[in-house]
Amino acid sequence: MKPVHLSILAAVARNGVIGRHNTLPWHLPEDLKHFKALTMGHTIIMGRKTYASIGRVLPGRTNVIVTRQLDFHAPDAIVVHTLEDALHLQGRQDDALFIIGGARLYEQTLGLVQRLYLTEIQQDFDGDTFFPVFDRSDWIEVSRERHVSDGQTGMAGMPLEYHFVVFDRKQTVEPKNLS
């Protein structure tokens, strides 16, 4: 069995915003393509609100939804009630697990993951949901790709600059255990 590789995947505005009223405050088709390319064929783990914002399971991936609502059901998805259950269940089936939101799952897993895939949006946005602050000195930036949106997705209808950034946890910083 291959070791499980646990990663966070998020799009984050310059001011830390990741959402507003349970939606993304921007529209970046290239970021959605990037998300799909990274996660296709793997397991994605999300909270119930993230699932609700998407509105369906994402095809070509094992969708795991973490919720405290014991009566929650989602067609074609695996529903669990703790993060530990999600990691235990999927850890036996897939060598790459992606935490895709929301804020609470990001907070719970930031100390556990080995890799961060961040789309860093080079602009502030109004929002009510934020990515947790993390100590960048615990991470090594392994890649950065600069992009500018084609459309009118930024403030005042201007193109939006964003970067696809990958961070790996430094070897001297051990991920935390779940127990």
What are these regions (language model features)?
Residues 3-5, 10-173, 179:
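Flexible, gly/pro- and Lys/Arg-enriched active-site loops
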